[in-house]
Amino acid sequence: MTARLSTALGAALLACACGAMAAPAAESESDDMVRLLNDRGLLVQLGDQLGQVRHTVGEKASELVMNAMGFLGVPYQRGGSSAETGFDCSGFVRAMYHQTVGLILPRRADQQAAATTTIDKSELRPGDLVFFNTMRRTFSHVGIYIGDNKFIHSPRSGSEVRVEDMRLGYWQTRFNGARRVQASDSQP
């Protein structure tokens, strides 16, 4: 997925999620994006997730979350850190923070947990990091919280960037904690 397509997809998702009315000049661009998403089979895949985002994030969605949503469907790639090659979980989080906020987080999920500020699960807000024990070790998986107990992540080999509910049994039993990224948490 090119950066231009990613940006356009993010903008289309933002418009859909917020229920924004497009200006007449922008309607053709929006229609073109809908056709592109439909032609690639992404509109059907994103349908339910767009509805979740509309109700979950609404107008309070951070630029980080909306940018991340633009990468739905990008394949998982172990060690991957770009849309062109695919993402692993920590590569996805690192890329989103670097692209959107300009912060460079550590590469591995456990390093990201150690470098960020611990918060209580009840304090989660869109853009915070959520960590899970998926490989029999703490902080072995990371995602970006988007609100309403949902997070976006790159889960595992053979899958792609997607939104999931933290209340599902698998994620609920493996939850390790929540972290907030502060400007001082980035590496030079």
Segments and roles (model prediction):
Residues T2-G10, M21-P75, V181-P188:
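Intrinsically disordered, low-complexity
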Residues R4, H55, L103-E160, D165-L168:
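...with weaker cross-activation on analogous glycine-rich loops/strands in unrelated enzymes
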Residues A15-A20:
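Short hydrophobic alpha-helical membrane-anchoring segments
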Residues H55-S62, A83-G91, T118, G169-Q172:
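Soluble non-cytosolic domains of exported or imported proteins
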Residues S62, M66-G70, G91-A95, Q99, ...:
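Solvent-exposed, polar/charged alpha-helical surfaces in well-ordered, non-transmembrane soluble domains
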Residues A68-G80, M96-L105, T134, P155, ...:
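Sec/Tat-exported extracytoplasmic proteins
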Residues V74-P126:
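Catalytic cysteine-centered active-site loop
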Residues M166-P188:
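Acidic, glycine-rich catalytic/binding loops that coordinate metals and/or anionic ligands
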